[in-house]
């Protein structure tokens, strides 16, 4: 890629920048530009800068991006692209100043003569927003035969300085997020790693290096995530490394196979039912699509869509075109080859996509994203374009691979049979309307409020805890659903078995939304769904089973932020002549104990510190005061920032592959933080 850098420096020059407005609005309302000022918004700063570097790679000017999380709280992103222009802009300022200080000053806003045909990150917008939300930003540019440097103090530019002569080109940006704006300025290595890995999958041949320099010598990890790992290091190299004063956590992402490697990665904990990965693409005026796909023996669909490398969590027209073509092609093939009788009803999309792992990546010159977060592609013309490409290519593949095609069709037919067998169970669940929970006597203790926005459903493990929760709740807005029997592991069961499970029926009926294609979020009866289980291993297992059910059957509940985990306390500190205190961790227990003793309090001798083994040990008053009272409780919202990572996690934890699960647990045994999946 780098060797093929185009000599079109002028096309991405001062004239390609169109200034629209300044940055003051960004600091006043940062959430409008980066989604939030929490952890997600903080990481969004990195994505915006990295997206610009990836734009250079997509345009054919760069083949390497280096990201460093530094010890002083800053992040540095470097690429070997053309470098941000430094020539004087029409406004009288250097172009780099315009890019860094004016909103919507990106190259792509100049129309046909702009720097990029296709762009993922809001080039210029993103960097200026990052600048606006940083206390300091430094940019080093190699371009026009020289090195250039510029710094910004709270978005105010210093002087652009020309440095030494150089033959290389590229841009390095380093920024310090403003702690007055963000709730936290602590970056999560795994969050960054997952996103960068995704970008490497989507840009075949691009190398992305991630280095975390915050770690200590004891935390060294040097992992090359690639089909072609580096050669083993010699004894001399190892000795030199160990003598180095500061070691870092490092990962390299490089995928020569692109989307094919992505599908291999998704299916690596599953059992593919055909060997070859289906891989094809197509180009049209202003559009480009690439798709890789492979079926596995599981029961869940795992389709991930991207537009201009942006993860379109909510799908859009590219996914609609793919689904339509796939359903049509498989049904036609099945009928033509007599794998499905003429009198048989057509296979549904759900039947066909059972066990399908697929990645759909489109590049669109003028994308229309629905919603501020850009997670759904809205271009209507993309649907027919993708549909046409998929129809042609999938038809050709099925005809050319009859043995694999038969296995795929037979799996879909088997899924259809299970669906038909499940219809009665599904209708039974549907008939038990949200107001008349026939067949579920005494289970759901509903709330008096009929406003879903104010209503909460606590799904509680066990009858004893359910009893305490019913007694301790505020019945105006809190409903309680105690679970008595075992929740089925939906990762290992088809829908007909899942819907026969009494506890699953109770949950689906109480929520009121339906499942899969029949899911309707407007019918949700509670806008907060709180999973409340014991803080021990068994409780965590129950929570994981419930999360797997919601993820596989009612994923929009998680996507829209309706699912929460209650955080019951682990300890109760009983003081003499003082009210008891509750601790939610060992550290908090120690802190409360130390503070209380310093304040002259005395702890009860025999049972001063009580460790709760389960929710059932708490009476109704304690449960309300610690876990259910909205003014004091701690709820953890379950998020879905990375559907592919969540999909993989559920497959590992709840699937058939024992070795993968053992390996995962061994690797993560020391990390006791809950995984926000």
UniProtKB/Swiss-Prot annotation:
SMART domains: HATPase_c, TOP2c
EC number: 5.6.2.2
InterPro entries: DNA_gyrase_B_C, GyrB, HATPase_C_sf, Ribosomal_Su5_D2-typ_SF, Ribsml_uS5_D2-typ_fold_subgr, Topo_IIA, Topo_IIA-like_dom_sf, Topo_IIA_B
Region (Disordered): 227-247
A GO term for molecular function: DNA negative supercoiling activity
GO biological process: DNA topological change; DNA-templated DNA replication
Domain Toprim: from-to ranges: 455-569
Entry's cofactor comment: Binds two Mg(2+) per subunit. The magnesium ions form salt bridges with both the protein and the DNA. Can also accept other divalent metal cations, such as Mn(2+) or Ca(2+).
Cofactor(s) annotated in UniProt: Mg(2+); Mn(2+); Ca(2+)
Remaining remarks: Few gyrases are as efficient as E.coli at forming negative supercoils. Not all organisms have 2 type II topoisomerases; in organisms with a single type II topoisomerase this enzyme also has to decatenate newly replicated chromosomes.
Subunit structure: Heterotetramer, composed of two GyrA and two GyrB chains. In the heterotetramer, GyrA contains the active site tyrosine that forms a transient covalent intermediate with DNA, while GyrB binds cofactors and catalyzes ATP hydrolysis.
Protein name: DNA gyrase subunit B
Source organism: Mycolicibacterium paratuberculosis (strain ATCC BAA-968 / K-10) (Mycobacterium paratuberculosis)
Lineage: Bacteria, Bacillati, Actinomycetota, Actinomycetes, Mycobacteriales
């Amino acid at each position: 890629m780098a060797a093929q850098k185009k000599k079109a420096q002028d096309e991405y020059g001062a004239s390609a920048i169109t200034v629209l407005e300044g940055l003051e609005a960004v600091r006043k309302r940062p959430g409008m530009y980066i989604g939030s000022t929490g952890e997600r918004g903080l990481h969004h700063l990195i994505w915006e800068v990295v997206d610009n570097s990836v734009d250079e790679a997509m345009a054919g000017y760069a083949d390497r991006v280096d990201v460093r999380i530094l010890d002083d709280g800053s992040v540095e992103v470097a690429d070997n692209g053309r470098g941000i222009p430094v020539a004087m802009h029409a406004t009288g300022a250097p172009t780099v100043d315009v890019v860094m200080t004016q909103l919507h000053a990106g190259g792509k806003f100049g129309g046909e003569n702009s720097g990029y045909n296709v762009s993922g990150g809001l080039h210029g917008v993103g960097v200026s927003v990052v600048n606006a939300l940083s206390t300091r930003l430094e940019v080093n540019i190699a371009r026009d035969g020289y090195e250039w440097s510029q710094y910004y103090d709270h978005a105010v530019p210093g002087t652009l300085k020309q440095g030494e002569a150089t033959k290389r080109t590229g841009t390095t940006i380093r920024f310090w997020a403003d702690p007055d704006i963000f709730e936290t300025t602590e970056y999560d290595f795994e969050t960054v790693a997952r996103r960068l890995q995704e970008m490497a999958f989507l840009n075949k041949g691009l190398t992305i290096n991630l280095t975390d320099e915050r770690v200590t010598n004891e935390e060294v990890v040097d992992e090359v995530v690639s089909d072609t790992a580096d050669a083993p290091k010699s004894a001399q190299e190892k000795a030199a490394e160990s003598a180095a004063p500061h070691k870092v956590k490092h990962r390299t992402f490089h995928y020569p196979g692109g989307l094919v490697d992505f599908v291999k990665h998704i299916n690596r904990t599953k059992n593919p039912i055909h060997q070859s990965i289906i891989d094809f693409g197509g180009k049209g005026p202003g559009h480009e699509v690439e798709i890789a796909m492979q079926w596995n023996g599981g029961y869940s669909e795992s389709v991930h869509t991207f537009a201009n490398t942006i993860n379109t969590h909510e799908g859009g027209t590219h996914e609609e075109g793919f689904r339509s073509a796939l359903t049509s092609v498989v049904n036609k093939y099945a009928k033509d080859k007599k794998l499905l009788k003429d009198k048989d009803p057509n296979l549904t999309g759900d039947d066909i996509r059972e066990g399908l792992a697929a990645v759909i990546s489109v590049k669109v010159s003028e994308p229309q994203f629905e919603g501020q977060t850009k997670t759904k592609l809205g271009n209507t013309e993309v649907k027919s374009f993708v549909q046409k490409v998929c129809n042609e290519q999938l038809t050709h593949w099925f005809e050319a691979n009859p043995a694999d095609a038969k296995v795929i069709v037979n799996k879909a037919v088997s899924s259809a049979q299970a669906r038909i067998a499940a219809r009665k169970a599904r209708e039974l669940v549907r008939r038990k309307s949200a107001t008349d929970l026939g067949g579920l006597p005494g289970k759901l203790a509903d709330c008096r409020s009929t406003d879903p926005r104010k209503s909460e459903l606590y799904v509680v493990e066990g009858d004893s805890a359910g009893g305490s929760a019913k007694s301790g709740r505020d019945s105006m807005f809190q409903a309680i659903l105690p679970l008595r029997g075992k929740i089925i592991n939906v990762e290992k069961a088809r829908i007909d078995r899942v819907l026969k499970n009494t506890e699953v029926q109770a949950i689906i009926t109480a929520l009121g939304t339906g499942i899969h294609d029949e899911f309707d979020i407007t019918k949700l009866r509670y806008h907060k769904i709180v999973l409340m289980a014991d803080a021990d291993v068994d409780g965590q297992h129950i929570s994981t089973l419930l999360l797997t059910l919601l993820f596989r059957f009612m994923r929009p509940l998680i996507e829209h932020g309706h699912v929460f985990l209650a955080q019951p306390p682990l300890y109760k500190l009983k003081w003499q002549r003082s009210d008891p205190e509750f601790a939610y961790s060992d550290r908090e227990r120690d802190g409360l104990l130390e503070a209380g003793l310093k304040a002259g309090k005395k702890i009860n001798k025999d049972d001063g510190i009580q460790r709760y083994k389960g929710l059932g040990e708490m009476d109704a008053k304690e449960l309300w005061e610690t876990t259910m009272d909205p003014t004091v409780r701690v709820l953890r919202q379950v998020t879905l920032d990375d559907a592919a990572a969540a999909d993989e996690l559920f497959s590992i934890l709840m699937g058939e592959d024992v070795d993968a699960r053992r390996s995962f647990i061994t690797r993560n045994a020391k990390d006791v933080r809950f995984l926000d999946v």
